[in-house]
């Protein structure tokens, strides 16, 4: 089975950057303690305020079960990020499979 790299990319309103980063760190810390997913948030080196949420998942089953595992805290933080910080609420998703 191949691992899966799942990414969610978006741009954040510059004036809300600090508040976004605090919320993203809260989400990262929560995911670290309450999920088995390998999860991180990164910023594009060449484009300030362009962020990517990165999940490295062990297999298709873990990928397919991601939404089912969202509890109220994850849902609330994710909704806040998308509604308050993301420019025009626009996100770009990409899914990549490890070659084997």
Question: Which residues does each PLM region occupy?
Answer:
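Short, well-ordered beta-strand segments in beta-rich or mixed alpha/beta enzyme
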Residues: 4-10, 40-69
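Absolute protein N-terminus
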Residues: 1-2, 100
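Short coil/turn motifs at secondary-structure junctions
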Residues: 13-15, 58-60, 100
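Short, surface-exposed ligand-recognition loops at beta-strand->loop->(often short) alpha-helix junctions
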Residues: 11-22
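Preference for well-ordered, secondary-structure-rich cores of eukaryotic proteins
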Residues: 11-13, 85, 95
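Short amphipathic alpha-helix segments
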Residues: 23-31
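Short, low-order "capping/linker" segments at domain edges
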Residues: 92-100
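An amphipathic, aromatic/His-enriched active-site/gating alpha helix that lines ligand/cofactor pockets
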Residues: 30-39, 56-92
């Amino acid at each position: 089975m191949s691992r899966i790299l799942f990414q969610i990319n978006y741009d954040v309103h510059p004036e809300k950057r600090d508040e976004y980063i605090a919320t993203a760190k809260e989400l990262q810390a929560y995911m670290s303690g309450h999920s088995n997913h390998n999860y991180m948030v990164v910023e594009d080196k060449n484009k300030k305020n362009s962020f990517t949420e990165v999940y490295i998942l062990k297999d298709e089953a873990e990928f397919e079960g991601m939404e089912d595992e969202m509890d109220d805290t994850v849902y609330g933080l994710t909704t806040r990020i998308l509604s308050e910080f993301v420019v025009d609420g626009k996100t770009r998703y990409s899914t990549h499979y490890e070659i084997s």
